[in-house]
Amino acid sequence: MNLKNKKALIIGVASKRSIAAAIASAFDASGADLLLTYQNEKLKNRVEEISNEMNSNILSYPCDLSSDSEISNLKKFIEEKWGKLDIIIHSAAFAPRELLSGDYVNNITREGFSLAHDISSYSFVALAKEFSKILNENATLLTLTYLGSQKVIKNYNVMGLAKASLETNVRYMAQSLGERNIRVNGISAGPIKTLAAAGISGFNEILKRVEEKSPLK
């Protein structure tokens, strides 16, 4: 993979074990110029520590995906530093921890439902809308989804609905941006021990079941 001189925005680096961190490392090794975002000051040091372990000088910038103004500020920063953008990696998802265990119907709340969809799905198209004018032709937008969007996964609950929304989002975004040769895709990764996965009750059992059933040992 040759990404030399490609400008890539990676959202969702929360720890060294996050999927976004692995993507950033692979992109760095392939020659891309990277910008990693962090949600708040608490995560800033983690992101900068990960950046310092890479080969290139990596940019970092704060962005709370629930804030339109912060997404706008991120775009302005990219315009100042790079002018244009080639790749957006959206690896962000969130739901209140108390909704990721137990009975779905009994535990669901209006606020939690809205928040899960806002951060996990709407933020992807919000980024595309804000950055549309600075995306190069043939740009790529990529997000991360999971089997829980298609099948009932114990304790995944509202995140399953949010991921289903995200996948439909991908299809409509692809149609909308396709005229400019901008590709929009989603990768459905298997269960991985990440910081986000730690919030799902019984995740280790899910991981064990997948390991038992997987044809690859």
Question: What do the PLM-derived regions correspond to, one by one?
Answer:
Residues 2-36:
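Canonical Rossmann dinucleotide-binding motif of NAD(H)/NADP(H)-dependent dehydrogenases/reductases
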Residues 12-21, 93-179, 191-193:
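Catalytic loop of short-chain dehydrogenase/reductase
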Residues 40-43:
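Helix N-cap at the beta1-alpha1 junction of Rossmann-like dinucleotide-binding domains, i.e.
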Residues 48-49, 158, 179, 189-215:
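A glycine/serine/threonine-rich, flexible loop-to-helix segment
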Residues 51-69:
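Rossmann-fold cofactor-recognition segment
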Residues 53-59, 76-91, 96-97, 101-104, ...:
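A glycine-rich helix->loop->beta "capping" turn
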Residues 66-80:
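Conserved Rossmann-fold cofactor-binding substructure of NAD(P)-dependent oxidoreductases
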Residues 89, 142, 184-187, 197:
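Hydrophobic structural elements of the Rossmann-like NAD(P)H-binding subdomain
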